[in-house]
């Protein structure tokens, strides 16, 4: 007689993932990282709620797969086999756990240490070369309300109006209640507090009952105390806003580190300002080796602190050359690289493209189109008149660098037929008949720009400039277009830096996987097929 057997359902507990899947490469690379600083970032009290190594793995892989929100990452950990493979049998973390890890742990030095270890690992295995670093910047919108702007100049005007109003109205109000108090032209917050304290003391001494509501008549001293409170609150707010602005011209009320700036994505086509951050990235062999998040709208002031950060992170490993675009050119940046000759600078001068046009070369008002005599230190204008050096002017940058500017003037401009073409208006209120030609020249900057023009025109300079466009700008294109990232999720400079750190790790793993699959390991510079052979 046949034996009946109960049917059984076979459940496979192993996760089948392709051998060449990016998640396997990510897991193998992240297992070689030292997480001692990451664990040290946690408090010593209590236990760690979830393994930070696993959290970092799932977050980096999520950024590789366009899943960057904490709730999307939580859902992926429950449903996606690749994320389950990274969990190593543990339960899926809660979205609050993921968010706390991103905001509180990666914002510290431990996050930058992980990127540094990854770069050094690639460098020691010959996959990354530090011979040339390509730096570029882009503006990314902050997670702040669009119309939450505070303008520094407007706040300064409001402060002046408020101080003027206090200076004009306060004496009469004090005279009405019989209080004597010295009022300076610009009264400070502490002086208003001192006056308010005296008013409260008078109210207590006289036994005055403070009233409010309809049908109640306030005493003059109560109206004065309320007026002082209003002025004091406004003055405190204006002082705080100016302090938050610092060297900037604006900030957002919902993200104090964000600055209002022009974005490339201007859908309204009206030049609308949006709160954002200036993200600077250094790339070597397609890999991101460092990033610098700035609230400055201009790239000029970000190069030196970025280089100091790279020198600190990779101490003992010298970066041979740094290639940047024309937005980073300044005399101060030239001087910094002259003081650090171990790193060579390649920057395209701002007038590099303009010089090629006939309009620029035929502009007689420009110093570059005038003949210069080094022996007599004079310039000769288009009409044959001499511009002689009359004085030397000293200026200082924000960091304290002294810049010497030579002033050249021409005293023979009366009756010149080329005067209107040679002297530009520039908003001057003087009539053209009373004006004369004046040019301001920084000889050191002119020498540095001339030397840089020759350097970037060489064969090596042309190759490096081409690779800067491919490698540095290519990373931004991949993040914005392929990963569809146009706006930060977190607020604050430190948290934004942690968010961009995850993108840097994700991009490096993706580049490494792509190089392995296409067998392009060890290729540092790309030579386009259209590149001139003679350069």
Map each language-model feature to its residues.
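N-terminal alpha-helical segment
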Residues: 3, 54-55, 94
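Short active-site-adjacent helix-start/loop capping segments
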Residues: 69, 84-85
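A short secondary-structure junction motif
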Residues: 32-37, 80, 84, 482
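Basic, short loop/linker segments at the boundary and entry of helix-turn-helix/winged-helix-like folds
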Residues: 18-60
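Anion-binding and metal-coordination hotspots
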Residues: 59, 66-78, 91-535
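Single conserved hydrophobic/aromatic residue that forms the stacking wall/gate
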Residues: 1-7, 11
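A Lys/Arg-rich helix-loop hairpin that forms a DNA/phosphate-binding surface
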Residues: 46-47, 87-91
């Amino acid at each position: 007689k046949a034996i009946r057997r109960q049917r059984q359902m076979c459940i496979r507990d192993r996760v089948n993932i392709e051998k060449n899947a990016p998640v396997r490469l990510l897991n193998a690379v992240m297992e070689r990282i030292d997480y001692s600083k990451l664990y040290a970032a946690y408090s010593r009290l209590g236990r760690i709620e979830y393994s930070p190594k696993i959290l970092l793995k799932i977050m980096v892989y999520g950024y590789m797969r366009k899943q960057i929100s904490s709730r999307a990452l939580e859902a992926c950990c429950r449903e996606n086999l690749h994320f389950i493979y990274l969990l190593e049998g543990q339960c899926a973390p809660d979205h609050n756990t993921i968010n706390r890890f991103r905001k509180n742990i990666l914002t510290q030095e431990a996050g930058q240490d992980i990127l540094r270890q990854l770069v050094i690992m690639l460098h020691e295995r010959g996959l990354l070369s530090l011979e040339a670093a390509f730096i570029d910047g882009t503006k990314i919108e902050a997670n702040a309300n669009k119309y939450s702007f505070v303008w520094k100049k407007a706040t300064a005007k409001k402060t002046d109006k408020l101080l003027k109003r206090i200076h004009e109205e306060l004496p009469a109000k004090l005279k009405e209640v019989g209080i004597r108090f010295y009022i300076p032209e610009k009264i400070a917050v502490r002086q208003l507090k001192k006056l308010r304290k005296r008013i409260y003391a008078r109210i207590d001494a006289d036994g005055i009952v403070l009233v409010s509501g309809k049908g109640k008549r306030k005493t003059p001293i109560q109206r004065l105390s309320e007026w002082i409170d209003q002025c004091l609150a406004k003055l405190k707010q204006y002082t705080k806003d100016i302090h938050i602005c610092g060297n900037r011209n604006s900030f957002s009320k919902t993200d104090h580190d964000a600055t209002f700036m022009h974005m490339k994505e201007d859908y309204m086509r009206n030049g609308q300002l949006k709160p954002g951050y200036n993200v600077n990235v250094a790339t070597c062999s397609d890999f991101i080796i460092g990033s610098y998040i700035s609230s400055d709208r201009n790239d000029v002031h970000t190069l030196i602190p970025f280089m100091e950060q790279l020198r600190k992170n990779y101490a003992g490993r010298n970066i041979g050359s740094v290639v940047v675009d024309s937005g980073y050119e300044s005399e101060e940046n030239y001087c910094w690289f002259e003081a650090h000759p171990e790193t060579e600078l390649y920057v395209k001068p701002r007038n590099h493209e303009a010089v090629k046009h006939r309009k620029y070369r035929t502009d007689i008002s420009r110093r570059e189109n005038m003949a210069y005599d080094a022996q007599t230190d004079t310039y000769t204008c288009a009409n044959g008149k001499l511009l002689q050096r009359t004085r030397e002017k000293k200026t200082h940058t924000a960091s304290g660098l002294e810049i010497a500017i030579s002033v050249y003037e021409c005293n023979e401009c009366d009756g010149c037929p080329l005067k209107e073409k040679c002297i530009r208006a520039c908003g001057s209120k003087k009539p053209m008949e009373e004006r004369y030609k004046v040019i301001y020249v920084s000889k050191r900057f002119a020498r540095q720009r001339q030397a840089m023009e020759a350097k970037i025109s060489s064969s090596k300079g042309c190759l490096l400039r081409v690779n800067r466009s491919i490698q540095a700008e290519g990373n931004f294109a991949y993040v914005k277009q392929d990963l569809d990232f146009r706006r930060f999720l977190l607020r604050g400079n430190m948290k934004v830096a942690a968010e961009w750190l995850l993108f840097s790790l994700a991009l490096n793993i993706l580049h490494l996987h792509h190089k392995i699959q296409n067998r392009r390991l060890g290729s540092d510079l790309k030579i386009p097929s259209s590149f001139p052979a003679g350069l």
